[in-house]
């Protein structure tokens, strides 16, 4: 099921060739490394240092050089990244509590062309989607990552609403 999720995200970010993608709450870098291995420029942000060490080691072992790893909170690093470069795609896979208000604010300030939100909690997903003004759901998929349990992952592909669409 993990490969299914990664392929889905890869299809959604296909238009991001040579453009910056942020993978926020990246964990050990699964999504970031999957995309970087296909030539995409990815900046992975994760607070848990051992996970970032694993991601760096995986990148080195697999000869992946188009992925940058930032250890620290999304609240800390995302504003710094968007102040330096235009972000085409923002991928967020937050913990069950969802995104903080400051992360939503940073997302909206960066005005990426697309946002991909992966969530394990339908309640916080709904709350956060409502706060992402200026974006429209383009596709949504439910993935049963943990068969025989009540847990699901929901992947949502949002595109920026262009002024002509308003």
Please report, for each region that a protein language model flagged, where it lies by residue.
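Rossmann-like S-adenosyl-L-methionine
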Residues: 1-166
């Amino acid at each position: 099921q993990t490969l299914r999720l990664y392929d889905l995200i890869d299809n959604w970010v296909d238009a991001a060739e040579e453009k910056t993608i942020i993978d926020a709450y990246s964990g050990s870098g699964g999504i970031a490394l999957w995309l970087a291995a296909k030539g995409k420029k990815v900046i992975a942000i994760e607070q848990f240092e051992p996970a970032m060490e694993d991601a760096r080691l995986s990148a080195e072992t697999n000869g992946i050089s188009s992925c940058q790893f930032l250890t620290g909170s999304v609240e800390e690093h995302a504003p710094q990244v968007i102040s330096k470069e235009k972000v085409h795609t923002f991928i967020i896979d937050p913990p069950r509590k969802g995104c903080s208000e400051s992360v939503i604010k940073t997302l909206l300030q960066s005005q990426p062309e697309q946002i991909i939100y992966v969530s394990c909690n339908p309640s916080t997903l709904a709350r956060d989607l409502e706060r992402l003004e200026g974006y429209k759901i383009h596709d949504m998929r439910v993935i049963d990552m943990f068969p025989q349990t009540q847990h699901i992952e929901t992947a949502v592909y949002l595109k920026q609403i262009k002024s002509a669409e308003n």
